[in-house]
Amino acid sequence: MASLGRQVPEWHRLMALSWACLARQTCHFRKEKKMSPSLFCKLTTVPSRGNFQEFSSVRPKKYMQEPEHRTRLVPCLHEEQRTCMGSESLELERAISSLQDMGFAEAHIDSLLNIQPSVHPQQLLDIISELLLLGLNPEPVFMALKKNPQLLKLSATQMKRRSSYLRKLGLGEGKLKRVLSVCPKVFTMRQQDIDNIVKVLKEKCLFTVQHITDILHRCPAVLQEDPSELEYKFQYAYFRMGLTHLDIVRTDFLQYSIAKVKQRHIYLERLGRYQTPDKKGQTQIPNPSLKNILRVSEAEFLARTACSSAEEFEVFKKLLDQEEEESESHMSEEEEEEEEEEEEELP
């Protein structure tokens, strides 16, 4: 009994210490606002009746407080979205103001901003500024971008590089207006393709530098032609029709398709209304001007130049197509025979 009497105060002291420890840990939990693994440990106390009982230090979930950063997450996201939208709106307003200062009409501004919606407004302004520096007015710039939206995907560096290249070809200071209206891909096509055309005009056709500049300015469609077909067109004009280099440049001959040229030239030739000049450039009959052959409509060509009916010209075109098909077939057969002979000669 004496021993039991001494144990009772010890049990009460142990219980008091356990509750004090629990109170300190709970207070610490509230201050830190987070759960510590040590708080999940269960405390064992000895009550006065001598039975062991477990007390959990974890409070019910309904009393747990959500972390502060979670409660602030959604407002932060909304604030970032509002900031982003405000920044985009400000950039758009600045772009519209700049385009107005450049001289673009309101309708053009709306169209420009919708041509490539993914393009940043500042990049749009950079591209347009480069085109204006080449001597273009707002109207041709708008038409060029509308015909070739890929222009807006170029960087300012690429635009400056291509502009410098075109200036070297003599296409600066306002001459690009016609080039862009006819061939808006002049800025986006490969430079190697342009070089190939210039090389044919210079080395195969023997045009001067000034002639090449005039051709690119007056007939920009040649930039999109196949180099071999362009060379053939020149040879037809020079050898079959007897035209000089200056005639070809001044009459914009290279802008017409070879099919149209051959149809009208050969038709006049068979009617006896056109002759190929001799070595001295002379003919027995006066040839009609190229303007009356190529620059006029088909109806005017037949009425004033050929003095023929539309039915006769249609029959002639069908016959000419058959002749060319037979000629091509005959040429391919000759090429095959030559290849077979070469193979037989090989040991």
From Swiss-Prot:
Which positions does the entry assign to MTERF repeats? 142-172, 177-204, 209-239, 245-270, 290-318
User: SMART domains annotated for this entry?
Assistant: Mterf
Q: Which GO terms describe its biological process?
A: camera-type eye development; heart development; mitochondrial ribosome assembly; mitochondrial transcription; protein targeting to mitochondrion; regulation of DNA-templated transcription; ribosome assembly; rRNA processing
Q: Taxonomically, which superkingdom?
A: Eukaryota
The main location class comes to mitochondrion
User: Which controlled-vocabulary keywords does the entry list?
Assistant: Mitochondrion, Repeat, RNA-binding, rRNA processing, Transit peptide
Q: What is known of its domains?
A: The MTERF repeats form a half-donut shaped, right-handed superhelix, where the concave side displays a positively charged path for nucleic acid interaction.
Tell me how this protein assembles: Heterodimer with NSUN4; this interaction may be required for NSUN4 recruitment to the mitochondrial large ribosomal subunit.
Protein name per its UniProtKB record: Transcription termination factor 4, mitochondrial
What taxonomic ancestry is recorded? Eukaryota, Metazoa, Chordata, Craniata, Vertebrata
